[in-house]
Amino acid sequence: MKKIGIIGGTTPESTCYYYQNYIKISREKFGPFTFPELIIYSINFEEFKNNPRGWEGRTEILINAARALERAGAEIISLSANTPHIVFPEIQKAVSVPMVSIIDALIEEMRRRGVKRVLLLGTKTTMTADFYKNALREAGFDVVTPVEEEMDEIDRIIFSELAFENFEHKPYLIDLIERYAREEGIEGVILGCTELPLAIKPGDVSVEVFDTAAIHMRKLIELAAE
């Protein structure tokens, strides 16, 4: 099997969730003791999140991590968070091994489940930037995003609570999803930040839940097994 490389640390909690899915999905697919080889390069999230050079500095950090994984023998590489995919093309150009996009894996799964209209939740960057919404719309999906004040609150919950495994405002997130189901006719919700699945589970809401971290890891394991 191919060796998987993951750029982690964005945040450490979501990287742990990736690893939990790696164990669960590998056992479902291969049995109790067979796992693709996996290398995790965990970056310093403080240097990433509050980089004084903004996305130029963040991109440099991610490229250095991807190159380190390539040198370590990774044959496929991924980012373990949604927001850094804003610079996915730049990172892919910097390495010679293929990278696996969380957005491409998500689109494939959304088509498989047959949904059309979805609510996108994530960091404020993910919800407002074009890179995510445009990819989904070009693939034929209707994408709904929260209003500005809701985006601010979701972003706060992600970085101030979920990043520390604090689920105090889980009811707020559930109520928001259900309201958009009633008022906007959404058929599914994209948990477009890999911290969100730590709080929101498929049985919590009445619409399809797209856990991007689990979907991404499943795709990585499928590709590793080819």
Give names to the regions the model predicted.
Residues M1-E226:
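Non-catalytic structural scaffold of enzyme domains
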